[in-house]
């Protein structure tokens, strides 16, 4: 059996890979590991996105948590970053999110936050996994009044929205904003926050039915929002993913403004105000080379990590940085929240837009994006890490790097949640790098499928 936890909790096809039994075991073992040392009745928050499997998995997860004597506070459908924030705000011992983020609706996932609102380190996940593999035989089995119970926190969403609004001063009166909620967890929170901040808000994909989350919409399918922004002549558009821990923007001309550009815009704004910690932005190896060029020209430093917001966060915590994130729109403002937060990011970008008086296209122009092609090679889960040892693949990558002569790069990495190897090639000529990426994908699929 491979490791249960991936890069972002436990994830799989609901009722096939992520079963109610596994959800129960995760609730049971997770609650025990995260609250075993407490001297009081442990309190654990549980929230979810809009997937049809959420109710099934929530029932099982909560049963597991209650079976070891913990109290569950059910928050219903709510963004992932809200759980991270509210776990701290409500003095809970842990928080749990039922979501598969940007994945299709048939997938779901379970991830934990500790009492400080941080995702769990590998060592804690390993303890949870060990208990599950051992069948949970040694776990406490409280009876009578010591069995856990569930209650509801009716104003949780409002508390989160008020927190996000409180991170800025002023309002967004006069700014026309289009938002795509991906039929996901932001469908109430995002409109509520922006309406309250007096923006002129138009919303699409805010009618979840359990199966339409991320379906042709949201931050992984931007075309609908791009067209909508131009159609209604909005100043800016925002597309969230299914659990709203990431966001991408669209400028007034319908062009995508990605996570790298958002960090560049906000980073420069904070630097100019003298409040960007060490004048540094933490990004990943997948960030566009244009971010590095911009930083060099503007007196910023870019620190690079492995792909994954957990690694970005780790670097930020270790070295005291306040701004970091990924090209995909996972952006962390560590002086406000402990994880990527799509709504918080949208509000911070709107603040820059309002204060600068500039159009988003002008702000985004501070960074020239080098053409970048990302193609997924479909491989087996068992073989997706073997590209590191494959001489043919290694030789082809070396030849491509030589061909680019320092004006491009090749990056290969396995997906943490799916049977894929992601091939990213960056360079000056889009046609050439697209052709080379397709050639490399064919080789990888031929050797690792």
Curated annotation (Swiss-Prot):
Modification Phosphoserine, positions: 101
Cofactor binding note from Swiss-Prot or TrEMBL: Binds 1 Mg(2+) ion per subunit.
Top enzyme class: isomerase
Swiss-Prot/TrEMBL keywords: Isomerase, Magnesium, Metal-binding, Phosphoprotein
GO BP: carbohydrate metabolic process; peptidoglycan biosynthetic process; UDP-N-acetylglucosamine biosynthetic process
Gene3D superfamilies in the cross-refs: Alpha-D-Glucose-1,6-Bisphosphate, subunit A, domain 3, Alpha-D-phosphohexomutase, C-terminal domain
EC number: 5.4.2.10
Residues the record marks as active site: 101 (phosphoserine intermediate)
Post-translational modification: Activated by phosphorylation.
HAMAP family with a match to the protein in the record: GlmM_B (MF_01554_B)
Protein's UniProt name: Phosphoglucosamine mutase
The organism of origin for this protein: Ruminiclostridium cellulolyticum (strain ATCC 35319 / DSM 5812 / JCM 6584 / H10)
